[in-house]
Structure formats: C-alpha cells, structure tokens
C-alpha cells in the first residue's frame, strides 16, 4: 500500500486499455473497423419493425432512476442487432471484498466480450483487437490479450425473387401483413456457421419475434 500513487495500479491500466475500444462515458465503440454500414434499407426496415411492435419492442427491467445508454426505440433496435458492443464478463486477480487488503495487486485479468455486427470477419477483427490492446501499453505494463471463441455474425443474403414473392404472398394471405426482416440474431454465429458449410443454400429463419410476433 505504501507504493500507491507511485506504482501504477493494474486496474487503472486495464481501464485505460478498455478505453481504447469503448468510450467509457457513452458506451460507444471507438474503432471504425468494429463498425459496419447500416444501410438506408436496413434503417427503413428497422423503423417499420419499431412502428409495428410499438410498446411490445423488447425492453429490459431497470432499477428506479437507472437510464439506458440508448433511449430512442429505433436506436435501441439498431444497436441491439447491427452495432458492436463491449461487455466485461469475468475477472481474476481481484480478491473478494471481504478478503481485500490495502495493498496494490500484481495483475488484473479481465474477460471481455465484443459483439461484432453481422458482415464483419471476426478473425480479422480479433487480430486487430489484440494489437490494439497489446501495442504501446501504458506505463510499460506487460499486457497479453488472448482471443477465444471467435465467430462471425450472420448477414443474411438476399432471397431469390420467387422465394421472396412467395413469402410475401403467404404472409399477406395468412396474417394480413407484409413479410419483414427482423435482423434479430444477426450477431449470433450459428447461422453464419451453417451458411459457411452450405454455401449454395438459402435460409429463412422464422419465429425470432416470439409467439406473438405475427
């Protein structure tokens, strides 16, 4: 504890490194290469979904007085499905509060999860994140970034016109509404794995909106 303020705190250094990826004030992901273009067509579709679902748009429980990072319903939907985000999901080197003493710790280990938008090469992104965290470390600290569980999100290719027309016809006939792309699950790698294995196949994933989606 006597060296506090002279010796760098490993937790402070970890915070500095995370700030290379995320704006700690807003939660916005900083590197441009972690973003992908949200096209006007995507925005229009998302806007239609938000208008259709209204109050049923997915919400999350919050303690009284706590505000979301994003408030506008359209921004919420786009952020959840088409934008990157960072979460700290685990930590080592930090003792439990009941056993913590007033001494500097030798290391802080964090496990982070970075959600990448559909359409990005996750392996390439992982190497860039590793370089971003390890290069020019603050105070000359020894920093190691190990990448695990790297997988692509799924950017659904355009359906053939006959399939799209049949889907539209069926939706109007049975539900009285036009068919829509929801983009939900686009950041989940399962469909990208299937598309990579069956490159000539087209997929229509339904039901993601929940039992009341229709």
PLM-predicted stretches and their roles:
Residues 1-7, 98-101:
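A short glycine-threonine-serine/GTX helix/turn-capping micro-motif
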Residues 29-107, 115-128, 136, 140-214:
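An extended, acidic, His-containing surface patch that forms the Zn2+-binding/catalytic region
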């Amino acid at each position: 504890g006597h060296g506090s303020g002279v010796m760098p705190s490993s937790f402070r250094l970890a915070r500095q490194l995370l700030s290379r990826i995320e704006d700690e004030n807003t939660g916005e992901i900083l590197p441009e290469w972690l973003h992908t273009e949200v096209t006007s067509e995507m925005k229009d579709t998302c806007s239609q979904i938000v208008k259709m679902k209204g109050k049923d748009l997915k919400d999350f429980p919050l303690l009284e007085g706590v505000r979301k990072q994003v408030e506008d319903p359209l921004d919420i939907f786009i952020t959840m499905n088409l934008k990157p985000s960072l979460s700290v999901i685990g930590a080592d080197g930090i003792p439990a509060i009941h056993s913590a003493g007033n001494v500097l710790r030798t290391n802080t280990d964090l496990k982070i999860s970075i959600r990448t938008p559909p359409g990005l090469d996750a392996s390439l992104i992982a190497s860039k994140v590793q370089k971003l965290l390890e290069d020019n470390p603050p105070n000359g600290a020894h920093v190691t970034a190990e990448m695990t569980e790297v997988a692509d999100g799924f950017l659904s290719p355009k359906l053939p016109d006959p399939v799209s027309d049949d889907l539209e016809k069926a939706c109007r006939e049975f539900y009285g509404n036009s068919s829509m792309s929801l983009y939900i699950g686009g950041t989940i790698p399962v469909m990208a794995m299937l598309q990579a294995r069956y490159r000539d196949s087209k997929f229509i994933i339904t039901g993601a909106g929940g039992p009341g989606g229709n």
